[in-house]
């Protein structure tokens, strides 16, 4: 009988396992199973386990293959475990690194032929187990570090998805055998039969029985080699939770790196003590050593969380410039590439191994033929079916190329990118259009629109006629009007319904799709630069491989939707010639080229310089440059292609030649300023370049151009003319606030300015009168960024300062849009969407929007000044001698007569130390219209200027009213002789309007009353300072001496007046007792002491006066050790005061030459010690206050002040470090010592002299990485800070390498 049974088993085929189980398995193969709407035919056995089989099944309708898991159970406990596995898989399905759940079904044991309950679980079919691929690769050598990084990162992403569930799902049986390789080459985690949501927290109250029960349950669901110390020894009372998956991941990483398990024998003692060893001589995987140690900690509390593991892997990937989400191509290449048919076919292990947890072990069987009885049992129908299956294997072997997962990526939840949806045979290597339709209909039923960017078309009915055909040409940037129209269309579709999504595709879902999606992200104001958008696309899908022209057109869109948009003009442009400097080396001898040019406008070729070979000029290196004359007028999208003409064998006789493309340039004329004469493109701005050796160093291409002054409107109005920018908000790109915050945390790094290697320049000459007529039509820049697209333009409009809205958050942008009016309709998406949150600037957490004008990195205009003169703007930097640019409070000044100060045309310096309250328009006879004292004058306001023009007494004094008032102003109340009329007279209206709008009035405390020298009192002060010479400004020494407050500081009460000796000065005399007016304007110049008197009591708190002295001869020195000439700055001779402000040391010496000065005699009285706050209300009005007591003066200071409120001080310190040195490896290394944390002594500062050659830079960079590498700071308080420094250095090093590792000189 046994012999007969063996014979039947032999005839049943090689798939038989023998006995009832084998017959059950064989009986199931070939059957048709219905799961929901799917009708599947079971084709063969893939694997078997303790109570489960895995089959390959094919959908009879679509031909798609699936993995069908058949689970058998005869116990209620097993039933619950199976149902739980199905529930977990269904809940976790959808993640790219977890096997996809499709369907499930079950029947009771009463209905089953096996007498057991049956459960069917349908999932996607993967290529095979990772173990088998690793074995094949490792036979040829160790696995590369990048491949291990991808494998482990994708595995951790799957575990992270499990741990993020509520409650967290713990896999408990993570091992390399449970990792599958998809047809696309990505990792898929499978087998959730051991997963649970229950955590255990043993303590001393647990009984031995309870510990034994828990240990038994855990042992049944885990693999011995991967068990954790807390599981092996429950009496350690460590918590048993998600950290057991971290331990298993550490074992997997160790196994991937060193091809052996850290606890190969599963010895409990070694596991409990964490005894494993990393090979000492390993240098290939050193980057993973610290990560392995951190994951294999005995105490689970000390192990890294899965989020920390993923973050460290991302940092390693960024440092190695690897996309960790990409397919593991090394495994696919070693195993036949993407074209392998079906999953890997491995030989079955002996007897089919089954572990203690009942997990499926590999038992794949090759079944190239069926058993003899299979044919007899199925009859002729089965025979022809098998023949049909065999004939279809050729197509199936090709169809498995990248099949199994659709090539579709979600940039956001509402923007998707995929490759071309193909039909027919082509669908074997591309997305099948039916699969795409089914996927989109299932996920976004009725709410998706497809945008086809490729020149090929297909039936729009496949996607319910919601297909937009764009037809963009390949290997060039799209036309601007087409790109802008596409962005408008996508925005309108997303606004219709908050459930709508946009699906964009070209042929491969790369360059063209990246341009469209990145431009749309910028159109919605998520980013303001192309670099940030392209980076997000690269991380969400793949590196797009775009050209500089693609990026240029994305920047065009950024400019057009900026806060102050730049609209392209409609002026034609004459391209005179193309100049290449130096001569490119395209000849066979590498000594020159024979170039010719083709120019396209849109799709039409407008000119070519191609001629017969001998008639085209050949340029040599000695020529220095190659010039191609053109003389063609273009407008709109311009494409210039430069070819090298090369003679072929026998070509001269046949008048034939071969052309070799050298490069091409594409741009839009609407963004070239009207006065540009030369457009310069660097080597990095050129498209379709050949090998770098053919382009000499500093190679650039210049277009000699001339922009016509008149507009030439196109036949059709461009789409941006009548487009309202209201309502553009980045939140339309997301489905909820959490998604937006996640995007900001990943891609919200502050956008970097343009890099030097990707900029071009524009030269221009003085504008002609015709050009000035159309001057206002030129696109204008709104940014102060030095690397702006139009930064170096010197247009006349730039007399008005640029007020770019730096760091404008989305919330601020929204408020601006709302403030524009209520005409914009709020979409349904915006009404139902999450509330907009303001983005807070950070080092790497948010995305502060840079100035709206920081665009067009590819083009910079270098334009000369126009013929129209420009009014100079007084800079605010340098020594502020008279406080002309300091800020102060605008306080109305009282009339001069109210203070009891007489009018005089001879008392030149009486108002030198008057309070600001004593200011009034001078009476007749005042030489310069003395209206305010030199030092204490109140600042001017625009209102004061208007009052002067209207003949009224101003509330505040304008120190430069004589300079600003017109000479023909007959309404001025002064009738005094105009002694300085010739050089003080100017047109006030022209002068005021010539200044920028933000400087229409002088700065608040621009006190220039040194020319207002009238109104000097005659009576000397009742208190005489102990000085042998008159010292008008002697009290200033007190400032320098007492700048640092001491214990003897004397508080100054409100309204108290101090002399230079520190004693309170009595109030001034009655106005009736003052000296009468003198006729000689300079008579009292030598009797200065007589012009000093007690000042009125209206002086602000903290005021003081200089020390007057008895009358001296006219030739007696009156100021000791003063500067040589009036108007120059000087420092009073006093004892050193290191902390004194520099502004307190620079003043005007109004009168007195060198020969008139003598030796200063010190005062007999002790000088007072006052605090720095005693003159708080005095100094701000005169420009002598410290800068830290004033508000920010510049936009940069305002941004820093805003950052300081919400940002970590360490991040602020890092931002200050990289400011102005973004991606400049030399600058960052030479200043690295300024940002290192306290106690770091391994780094020795380096200078620029140590960073001249690329070798020196590389050496210092490696030293710096050893110091700041985050792995060396694990667990330290400065760990996060070290990570930020490391990332900045790494970005700078990558940029240094991308630019060719050039030497400094």
From Swiss-Prot:
The modification N-acetylserine is found at residue 2. The modification Phosphothreonine is found at residues 774, 792. One of its GO terms (molecular function) is protein serine/threonine kinase activity. GO terms for cellular component: clathrin-coated vesicle; focal adhesion; Golgi apparatus; perinuclear region of cytoplasm; vesicle. The modification Omega-N-methylarginine is found at residue 1122. Residues 1241-1305 form the J domain. Residues 570-708 form the C2 tensin-type domain. The active site is at residue 173. Residues 707-732, 747-854, 1037-1139 are annotated as: Disordered. It is an enzyme of class 2 (transferase). Belongs to the protein kinase superfamily. Ser/Thr protein kinase family. This is Cyclin-G-associated kinase. The gene is Gak.
């Amino acid at each position: 009988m046994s012999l007969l049974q063996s014979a039947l088993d032999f005839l049943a085929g090689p798939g038989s396992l023998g006995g009832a189980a084998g017959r059950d398995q064989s009986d199931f193969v070939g059957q048709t199973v219905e799961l929901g709407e799917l009708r599947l035919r079971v084709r063969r056995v893939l694997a078997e386990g303790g109570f489960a089989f895995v089959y390959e099944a094919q959908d009879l309708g679509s031909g798609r293959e699936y993995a069908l898991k058949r689970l058998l159970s005869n116990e209620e406990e097993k039933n619950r475990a199976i149902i739980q596995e199905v529930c977990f898989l269904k809940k976790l399905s959808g993640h790219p690194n977890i096997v996809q759940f499709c369907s499930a079904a079950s029947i009771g044991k009463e209905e089953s032929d096996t007498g057991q309950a049956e459960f069917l679980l349908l999932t996607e079919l993967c290529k095979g187990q990772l173990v088998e691929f690793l074995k094949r690769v490792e036979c040829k050598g160790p696995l590369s570090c990048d491949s291990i990084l991808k494998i482990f990162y994708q595995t951790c992403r799957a575990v992270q998805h499990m741990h993020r569930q509520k409650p967290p799902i713990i896999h408990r049986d993570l091992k390399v055998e449970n990792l599958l390789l998809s047809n696309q080459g990505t990792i898929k985690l499978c087998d959730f039969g051991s997963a649970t949501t229950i955590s255990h927290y043993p303590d001393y109250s647990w009984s031995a029985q309870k510990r034994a029960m828990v240990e038994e349950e855990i042992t049944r669901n885990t693999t011995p080699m991967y068990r954790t110390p807390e599981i092996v020894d429950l009496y350690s009372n460590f918590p048993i939770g998600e950290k057991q998956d971290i331990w298993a991941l550490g074992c997997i990483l160790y196994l991937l790196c060193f091809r052996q398990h850290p606890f190969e024998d599963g010895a409990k003692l070694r596991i409990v003590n964490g005894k494993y060893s990393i090979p000492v001589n390993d240098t290939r995987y050193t980057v993973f050593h610290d990560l392995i140690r951190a994951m294999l900690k005995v105490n689970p509390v000390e192990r890294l969380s899965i989020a920390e593991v993923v973050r460290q892997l991302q940092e390693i990937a960024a440092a190695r410039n690897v996309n960790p989400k990409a397919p593991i191509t090394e495994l696919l290449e070693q195993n036949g590439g993407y074209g392998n048919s079906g999953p890997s076919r491995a030989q079955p292990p002996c007897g089919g191994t089954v572990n203690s947890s009942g997990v499926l072990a590999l038992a794949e069987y090759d079944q190239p033929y069926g058993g003899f009885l299979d044919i007899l049992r199925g009859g002729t129908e089965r025979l022809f079916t098998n023949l049909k299956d065999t004939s279809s294997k050729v197509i199936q072997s090709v169809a498995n190329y990248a099949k199994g997962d659709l090539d579709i990526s979600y940039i956001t939840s509402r923007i998707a990118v995929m490759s071309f949806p193909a039909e027919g045979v082509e669908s074997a290597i591309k997305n099948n259009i039916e699969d795409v339709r089914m996927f989109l209909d299932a996920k976004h039923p009725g709410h998706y629109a497809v945008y086809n960017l490729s020149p090929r078309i297909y039936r729009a009915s496949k996607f319910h006629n919601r297909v937009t055909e764009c037809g963009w040409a390949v290997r060039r940037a799209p036309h601007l009007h087409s790109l802008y129209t596409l962005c408008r269309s996508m925005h309108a579709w997303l606004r219709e319904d908050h459930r709508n999504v946009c699906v964009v595709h070209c042929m491969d879902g790369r360059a063209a799709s990246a341009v469209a999606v990145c431009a749309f992200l910028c159109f919605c104001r998520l980013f303001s630069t192309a670099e940030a958008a392209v980076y997000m696309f690269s991380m969400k899908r793949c590196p797009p491989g775009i050209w500089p022209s693609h990026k240029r057109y994305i920047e065009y869109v950024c400019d057009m939707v900026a806060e102050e948009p730049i609209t392209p003009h409609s002026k034609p442009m004459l391209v005179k010639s193309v100049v290449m400097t130096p001569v490119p080396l395209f000849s066979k001898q590498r000594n020159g080229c024979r170039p010719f040019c083709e120019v396209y406008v849109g799709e039409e070729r407008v000119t070519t310089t191609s001629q017969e070979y001998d008639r085209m000029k050949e340029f040599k290196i000695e020529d220095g440059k190659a010039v191609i004359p053109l003389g063609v007028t273009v407008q709109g999208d311009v494409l210039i292609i430069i070819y090298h003409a090369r003679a072929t064998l026998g070509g001269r006789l046949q008048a034939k030649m071969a052309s070799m493309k050298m490069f091409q340039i594409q741009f839009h004329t609407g963004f070239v300023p009207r006065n540009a004469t030369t457009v310069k493109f660097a080597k990095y701005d050129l498209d379709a370049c050949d090998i770098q050796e053919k382009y000499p160093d500093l190679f650039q291409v210049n277009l000699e151009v001339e922009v016509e002054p008149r507009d030439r409107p196109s036949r059709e109005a461009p789409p941006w003319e009548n487009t309202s920018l209201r309502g553009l908000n980045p939140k339309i790109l997301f489905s909820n606030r959490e998604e937006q915050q996640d995007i900001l945390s990943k891609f919200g790094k502050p956008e970097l300015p343009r890099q030097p290697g990707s900029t071009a320049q524009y030269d221009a000459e003085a504008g002609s009168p015709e050009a000035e007529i159309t001057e206002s039509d030129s696109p204008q820049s709104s940014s102060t960024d030095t690397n702006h697209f139009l930064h170096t333009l010197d247009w006349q409009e730039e007399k008005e300062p640029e007020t770019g809205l730096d760091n404008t958050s989305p919330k601020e942008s929204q408020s601006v849009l709302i403030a524009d009016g209520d005409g914009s309709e709020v979409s349904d998406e915006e009404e139902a969407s999450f509330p907009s949150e303001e983005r807070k600037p950070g080092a790497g957490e948010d995305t502060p929007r840079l100035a709206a004008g920081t665009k067009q990195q590819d083009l910079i205009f270098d334009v000369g000044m126009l013929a129209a003169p420009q009014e100079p703007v007084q800079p605010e930097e340098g020594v502020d001698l008279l406080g002309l640019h300091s800020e102060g409070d605008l306080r109305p000044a009282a009339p001069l007569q109210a203070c009891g100060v007489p009018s005089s045309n001879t008392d030149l310096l009486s108002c030198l130390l008057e309070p600001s309250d004593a200011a009034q328009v001078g009476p007749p006879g005042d030489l310069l219209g003395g209206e305010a004292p030199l030092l204490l004058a109140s600042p001017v306001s625009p209102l004061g200027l208007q009052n002067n023009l209207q003949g009224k007494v101003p509330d505040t004094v304008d120190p430069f009213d004589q300079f600003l008032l017109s000479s023909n102003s007959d309404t001025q109340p002064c009738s005094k002789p105009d002694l300085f009329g010739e050089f003080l007279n100017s047109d006030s209206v022209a002068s005021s309007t010539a200044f920028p709008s933000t400087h229409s009035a002088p700065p608040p405390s621009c006190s220039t009353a040194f020319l207002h020298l009238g109104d000097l009192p005659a009576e000397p002060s009742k208190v005489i300072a102990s000085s042998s010479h008159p010292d008008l400004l002697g009290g200033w020494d007190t400032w320098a001496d007492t700048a640092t407050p001491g214990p003897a500081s004397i508080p100054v009460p409100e309204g108290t007046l101090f002399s230079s000796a520190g004693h309170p000065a009595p109030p001034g005399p009655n106005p009736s007792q003052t000296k009468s007016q003198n006729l000689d304007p300079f008579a009292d110049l030598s009797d200065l002491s007589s012009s000093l008197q007690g000042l009125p009591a209206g002086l602000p708190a903290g005021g003081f006066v200089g020390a007057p002295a008895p009358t001296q001869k006219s030739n007696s020195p009156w100021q000791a050790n003063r500067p040589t000439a009036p108007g120059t700055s000087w420092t009073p001779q006093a004892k050193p005061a290191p902390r004194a402000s520099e502004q307190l040391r620079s003043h005007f010496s109004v009168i007195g030459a060198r020969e008139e000065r003598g030796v200063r005699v010190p005062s007999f009285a002790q000088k007072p010690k006052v605090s720095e706050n005693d003159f708080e209300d005095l100094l701000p009005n005169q420009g002598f206050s410290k800068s830290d007591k004033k508000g920010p003066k510049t936009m940069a200071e305002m941004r820093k002040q805003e950052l300081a409120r919400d940002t970590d001080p360490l991040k602020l310190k890092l931002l200050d470090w990289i400011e102005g040195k973004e991606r400049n490896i030399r600058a960052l290394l030479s200043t690295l010592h300024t940002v290192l944390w306290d106690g770091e002594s391994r780094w020795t500062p380096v200078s620029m002299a140590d960073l001249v050659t690329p070798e020196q830079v590389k050496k210092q960079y490696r030293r710096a990485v050893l110091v700041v590498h985050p792995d060396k700071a694990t667990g330290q308080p400065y760990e996060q800070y070290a990570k930020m420094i490391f990332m900045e250095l790494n970005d700078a090093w990558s940029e240094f390498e991308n630019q060719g590792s050039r030497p400094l000189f």
